[in-house]
């Protein structure tokens, strides 16, 4: 079994810490040296993607130190224990099995006589069969008419990931004639969110997916009641318009208020559930089960790469190690995720939850305080929009923020126009290439207001086109990166106690069980 130790107790980390500022990236990326780095520092990913880290502050010395850290921290051994069913979520005493929802990397994992790989595949098949029946008109509304829109009601991991994936493939599906149903999402307990979505759909032809593992999530049940009320007012039977995605032990599981129930379990956390049955329901309804299967295939292929002990052939682990070097040695406080693809407009928000909810911890997996910084702040926007928003701080601010670019050679719809000898897609790609070099190399100017120091590190993931398979690989890459970083920091990346306290206090407010500042704030908001 692997040994779990704090980062600052590892000899390899002490050696790595001696390499602070070792590479001057402005110098390393200049001229022909930079050209050679771009060719050299590149690692294949799954589904035709490539992870290029030429503009990161690494060289052979730093990479060797990172490899030694990976070995001493036993990263691959810990990953193997995870996918073979060890109790990695120490806080909740649970296994962590989201990889098993897309592939089997190791041994059978059996719980109470149930093979978990078979269970996850069965739930995905259940979602696929339901979607096929809806598309074929075998499952219809009260009047025997086909459903045309599907609306998911959920919050957190039940919203951010599925929403990001749907938006990512919406145009691809149109271009490839796989659009089956329009999808929408209700997440916030703010009534304006639900009201706006309901006003935009034809209720008689709308199908609603209620997603709550526990069946008790306040925001989700509140929004479900909001939707049921609207359906009843429209003279419709809610039970003919709703299905549930929940656990087998939740109150929703055997309720007759739903057309069917698709099950998830406690071994896949919400933020890691985008390639499980949970997201499979809405994505299969929107695009067809075959498209969701391609997402799973891309993720599975990336997972297999993540088992390689050689960091130069394991893009997920390499990205994680470089991130730890930037956070703990270089002292950078944040990471910006910058997809130069409008289709990935909600991907940074999903990664924000996945990363910050996983590694935003100040105690190790044994509940002991750590004496080093852990997860960075994650934020981002698609390019080129972000260039006209927060890039000013990234270029000339007092903090250095590492950047993770994502770019594709082709657009999804293939509709473009040539203006001034270049297409819109070429202009988009030109901007991302220019930004990488501008951040790394900067530009000297005697006017300090126009001087760019450079030295801002970045990586880029590139591909031919954003497809279901490449989207799955992209998602798995970042999930695995977050996992490896949690291993290095000796954290439990799979619980989220920070979400709970506010929920408890909110229930007190609603029950009017308040005093002190909580009472004054409640009165201020007229609760």
What positions do the PLM features span?
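Glycine-rich phosphate-binding loops that contact phosphosugars or nucleotide phosphates
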Residues: 129-137, 143-309, 508
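Extended, charge-enriched "interface" segments that sit outside catalytic cores
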Residues: 4-143, 421-429, 440-441, 463, ...
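Conserved active-site and cofactor/substrate-binding residues in soluble primary-metabolism enzymes
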Residues: 11, 36, 57, 61, ...
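C-terminal structured subdomain/cap of oxidoreductase catalytic cores
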Residues: 450, 466-518
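Short glycine-rich or small-residue beta-strand-to-loop segments that form or flank ligand, phosphate
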Residues: 148-156, 208-214, 334-341, 378, ...
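Active-site phosphate/pyrophosphate-binding segments
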Residues: 230-415, 454, 501-527
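Acidic, Ser/Thr-rich peripheral helices and adjacent loops at domain boundaries
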Residues: 415-450
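Flexible, glycine-rich loop/tail regions that form catalytic "lids" or insertion modules at the edges
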Residues: 2-74, 313, 317-329, 344, ...
